[in-house]
């Protein structure tokens, strides 16, 4: 019996389809993200939400993401930073939120961390939420006329990051 003629494919080649990756749908992407979120520590999950909050189109969306981050990880300092910017209606309101952020950041990093890494904070990504909260706190204190307290926080920030990456000296 004669063989079937091949399609117009040069001899020795294989069809392309088996080499292509399997197509995935939106449902697969969501399932992968869900599995990834479950595998992350609560602190990482919360920070992922904060990363979205920084990019949110509205203050309301940013605040909702920050609140969700706090439900997952109550010591998420950046959540308080987002809320201070998104929800505070006065310097007093922002002050309270920044104080919570500073406290949360200190608990997350731990006292030994401060002693060990003093002078090198800015170079360590995990310190940035704390540094942002403390700078926000200093700015609020200054705005409220509590200059001496503000300066104390600024001096502490400069001890942690002497290169003044936050522009404390010029703020």
Per-range role (PLM):
Residues 1-117, 134, 141-163, 170-171:
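N-terminal alpha-helical interaction modules that lie
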Residues 122-139:
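Extended HEAT/HEAT-like alpha-solenoid repeat tracts in very large eukaryotic scaffold/adaptor proteins
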């Amino acid at each position: 019996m004669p063989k079937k003629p091949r399609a117009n494919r040069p001899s020795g080649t294989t069809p392309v389809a088996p080499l292509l990756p399997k197509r995935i749908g939106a449902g697969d992407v969501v399932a992968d993200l869900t599995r990834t979120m479950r595998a992350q520590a609560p602190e990482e999950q919360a920070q992922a939400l904060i990363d979205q909050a920084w990019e949110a189109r509205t203050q309301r969306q940013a605040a909702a993401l920050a609140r969700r981050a706090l439900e997952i990880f109550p010591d998420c300092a950046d959540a308080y930073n987002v809320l201070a910017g998104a929800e505070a209606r006065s310097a007093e309101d922002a002050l309270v939120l920044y104080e919570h952020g500073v406290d949360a950041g200190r608990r997350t990093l731990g006292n030994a961390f401060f002693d060990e890494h003093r002078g090198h904070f800015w170079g360590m990504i995990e310190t940035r939420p704390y540094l942002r909260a403390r700078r926000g706190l200093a700015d609020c204190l200054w705005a409220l006329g509590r200059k001496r307290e503000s300066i104390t926080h600024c001096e502490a920030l400069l001890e942690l990051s002497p290169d003044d990456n936050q522009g404390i000296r010029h703020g």
